[in-house]
Amino acid sequence: MIGLRPAFSTMLFLLLLTGGVYPLLTTALGQWWFPWQANGSLIHKDNVIRGSALIGQSFTAAGYFHGRPSATADTPYNPLASGGSNLAASNPELDAQIQARVAALRAANPQASSAVPVELATASASGLDNNLTPGAAAWQIPRVAAARQLPVEQVAQLVAEYTHRPLASFLGQPVVNIVELNLALDALQGHRAK
C-alpha cells in the first residue's frame, strides 16, 4: 500500500493540473488577450449574430458572392458534419461533381470570360471554408454587380476593402472573407439580395 501512495498522489496532482488548472488558465488567457477569437469570431449586425468569420455560409442568390462548395453531408456548411468528400482524385464521381459545378458556375456567371477558378469548383478538406482568393471573388464581380444593379467598380472596391493580407507574404496569401463581404453588400444597399 505504501508503494501506491506516490502513484495516487502523482495521478491526483496531474488530474488537477491538466483537468483543472491548465484549461482554466488557457480559457482565462484567451478571454483576456483574444476575446473575439476565443468566443468564435462571431459577426454581429443589428445586435443579431449573422455568422462566424471562421465558417462559410451557403449563399446561392445571384446578388451574393458564392464561396467554395461545401462537402458537408445533407446541409451545406454544417459545422457538425465538417469534413471533405473523401473522394480520391482518381474517382469518377469526384470528376463528375467538379464538371457539374463548373457547368453551373458558367451558367450563373455568363459575364465571366476567364476559366472558372479552381476553388469555386472544388470543396475544401473541412467543407466549411469562408475565404476565397481575390481572383475567385473578382471572377464573380460582374454577376453580383448586375444582380444588385451596382457599378462594377463599386463592387470591385468592396472586394478590395475586404481582402485580408497576411503580415508577410511567406505567412500565406491574401484572402477575401465571403461572409463579411456579403454582409457588407447588404449593409451598402440596406437590404438582403433576392
From Swiss-Prot:
Functional note: Part of the high-affinity ATP-driven potassium transport (or Kdp) system, which catalyzes the hydrolysis of ATP coupled with the electrogenic transport of potassium into the cytoplasm. This subunit acts as a catalytic chaperone that increases the ATP-binding affinity of the ATP-hydrolyzing subunit KdpB by the formation of a transient KdpB/KdpC/ATP ternary complex.
- The protein's superkingdom reads Bacteria
Upper classification of the source organism reads: Bacteria, Pseudomonadati, Pseudomonadota, Gammaproteobacteria, Enterobacterales
Molecular function (GO) terms for this protein are: ATP binding; P-type potassium transmembrane transporter activity
Q: Which UniProt keywords apply?
A: ATP-binding, Cell inner membrane, Cell membrane, Ion transport, Membrane, Nucleotide-binding, Potassium, Potassium transport, Transmembrane, Transmembrane helix, Transport
Species of provenance:
Salmonella heidelberg (strain SL476)
Indicate yes or no for the key word rRNA processing: no
Identification of the protein by name: Potassium-transporting ATPase KdpC subunit
- Indicate whether Hydrolase appears among the record's keywords: no
Q: How does it assemble?
A: The system is composed of three essential subunits: KdpA, KdpB and KdpC.
Q: Which Pfam families match?
A: KdpC
